[in-house]
Amino acid sequence: RPPRSTLFPYTTLFRSLAFENNIPLVAVSHIEGHIAANYLTYPQLVPPYMCLLTSGGHTAILKVEDYNQRTLIGSTIDDAVGECFDKVARVLGLGYPGGPKIDKLAKEGKSEITFCKTPLVGTYNFSFSGVKTAVINYVHNKEQKGEGINKADVAASFQEEVCGELVKKSTRAAREYGMDKLVVAGGVSANSRLKEMLKGECEKQNISLFMPELGLCTDNAAMIGSAAYFMMKKGEGLSDTNLTASSVVKI
């Protein structure tokens, strides 16, 4: 997430614009923005629904009861999924951002390497530090032995395991909470394998799947505007000119 200091200039700018033009100033959570991106792609989408949040800083399953009203069902206890993609991409020498690079490389490989299985069963929480560490150790061990690795196979195997966990828990949550709609939000929703796996599983379970168009998956101003629109309709989020920025977002 960005340092708090980087947000201050923009907060000051928007406070000034709102004051000078006598227009509302709405405080929008980054998470609310990612969720609200789906309302731009699917105008017909209305709560309630189950939401899978997948971003660089957050991974969670949320029950969305109403616009800007949600209940946390489960979340990561260590690394966020986007962060995990970035760290694995780094050890493979792919650079940043890791998500798109692993997604592209994985198409050339086979998901035949077993790294580790998540230890969290019987819960909606996630843990990605185990598979991340397993991949890093695998690569380092091969390098120490002077053995080559097939980076495409590593990328495909890692991606398959992580996406499988996201799909399994989010669809199970939707089913067990009686939700027939699953909404996906955050930058990792752009992952092609995640889309493919979610589509297949949701079709099997008769769950309607909603994923934002590619241009709205990562951080963008439109998603913030969408969230602000629904907040203003309910008279929520209106702030005065003393609004301050925060780099820590509570799910």
What feature does the model see in each segment?
Residues R15-P24, P43, E176, S226-M231:
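Alpha-helix C-terminal capping segments
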Residues F14-H34, T76-D78, S208-M211:
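Short, acidic/small-residue loops that bind anionic groups at enzyme active sites
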Residues A27-V28, L182, K199-I224:
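Conserved phosphate-binding/catalytic loops in two-lobed NTP-binding clefts
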Residues M179-L198:
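Glycine-rich phosphate-binding loops at beta-strand->alpha-helix junctions
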